[in-house]
A protein has these predicted regions:
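Short hydrophobic interaction/assembly module
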Residues: 44-66
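Conserved AdoMet/S-adenosylmethionine-binding subsite of the radical SAM
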Residues: 58, 62-66, 70-73, 78, ...
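Auxiliary Fe-S-binding modules of radical SAM enzymes
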Residues: 1-18, 59-62
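Canonical Radical SAM [4Fe-4S] cluster-binding loop centered on the CxxxCxxC motif
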Residues: 8, 14-52
Length: 154
């Protein structure tokens, strides 16, 4: 059974993609960005996370669908949603089947398998940390290799 670790869910997101959106903040991120807004999402298992199956999460999201109107939907953010690729992919697939617009707000630092994820994604908000290798490492503490792999998949 696939499970996902979710930090929190915001039901009235107005700045995380077009329209009125529900924002799902995933738990877990490998980066340690100097300016991170959500450092409490860094660890995958914080002890405070909510655990969902894909079906449970989508059933929760369906309750908000009437508020999305013609141009809203759901945005998956974090943390880094791409780190939970199997869970994310199944949630995206179920959302698309339910007619929910999908968006991923990501730094592009996951575990590969991006083509399948992107096949069920309507919009990607890609956080480009820096344009140089040294600058990227200085800000995130990591190499940009995984980011570049995701960028080529997009």
């Amino acid at each position: 059974m696939i499970e996902g670790y979710i930090h929190s869910i915001e039901s009235m997101g107005l700045v995380d993609g077009p329209g009125i959106r529900t924002v799902v903040f995933f738990q877990g991120c490998r980066l340690r960005c100097r300016y991170c807004h959500n450092p409490d999402t860094w660890t995958m298992r914080s002890g405070k996370e909510q655990i969902f199956t894909p079906e449970q999460l989508v059933n929760k999201l369906l309750r908000f669908k009437p508020y999305f109107g013609d141009n809203g939907g759901v945005t998956f953010s974090g943390g880094e949603p791409l780190l939970q690729k199997d869970f994310l992919c199944e949630v995206l697939r179920l959302c698309k089947h339910a007619g929910i617009h999908t968006c991923i707000d990501t730094a592009g630092c996951g575990c590969g398998g991006y083509e399948e994820i992107l096949a069920h994604t309507d919009l990607v908000l890609l956080d480009i940390k820096h344009f140089s290798l040294d600058g990227y490492h200085s800000i995130t503490g990591q190499s940009p290799q995984e980011f570049l792999q995701f960028l080529s998949a997009v």
